[in-house]
């Protein structure tokens, strides 16, 4: 995935954008919360492992990239643009989901074998981290959406989508959810879950192998969006 996205930045002549974005406070805020799983909070190695695994599974694998996945997939689905990028995002999206499911399975196995590790203090710490994660992700969404208001693509809808992913992640490991979710807004995002979890059928008449265009090819902004 890394090579594909690096290639995409090269095609768009945006090689420096990653380093530039890291200078933004809200981007650095995301980096900081995603690195919390490396911080030591518990003297018990078993509990520290569980804490780190839970943060990594829930937030790195199952939340942090999904607002971006949603936006790219939305443009491909409803505007018929960014098709090559959309295909790469789908590969990444599906693999991140698998990674998260594996992590959740491991966490639940630990719960079965060592239930004493799952005390009230751990749950409240994880739920608190979930709220901090959402605050960081919400700032990313506002920056990324930048005032767009389309059916299924506006800041409020994408934020509800993220809240729901966080709630679902917590519930899958036996913790209480932290957010009230607007089901009416969430309804507009169900296509994403259907694509992610359902069995997709290939349209052999229109689906074809694609490659990123060479950097030498010129692009018009209207062609991309």
Give residue ranges: language-model regions.
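Non-heme di-metal
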Residues: 1-225
């Amino acid at each position: 995935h890394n090579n594909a996205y690096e290639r995409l930045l090269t095609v768009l002549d945006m090689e420096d954008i990653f380093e530039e974005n890291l200078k933004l406070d809200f981007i650095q805020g995301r980096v900081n919360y995603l690195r919390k799983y490396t911080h030591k909070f518990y003297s018990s190695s078993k509990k520290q492992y569980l804490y780190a695994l839970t943060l990594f599974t829930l937030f790195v694998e199952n939340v942090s990239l999904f607002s971006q996945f949603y936006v790219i997939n939305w443009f491909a689905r409803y505007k018929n643009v960014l098709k090559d990028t959309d295909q790469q995002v789908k590969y990444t999206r599906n693999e991140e989901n698998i990674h998260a499911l594996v992590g959740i399975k491991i966490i639940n196995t630990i719960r079965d074998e060592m239930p004493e590790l799952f005390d009230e203090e751990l749950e409240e710490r994880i739920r608190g981290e979930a709220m901090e994660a959402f605050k960081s992700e919400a700032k990313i969404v506002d920056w990324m959406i930048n005032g767009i208001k389309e059916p299924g693509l506006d800041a409020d809808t994408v934020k509800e989508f993220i809240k729901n992913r966080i709630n679902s992640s917590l519930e899958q490991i036996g913790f209480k959810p932290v957010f009230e979710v607007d089901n009416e807004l969430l309804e507009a995002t169900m296509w994403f879950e259907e694509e992610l979890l359902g069995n997709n059928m290939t349209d052999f008449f229109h689906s074809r192998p694609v490659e990123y265009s060479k950097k030498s090819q010129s692009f018009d902004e209207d062609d991309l969006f």
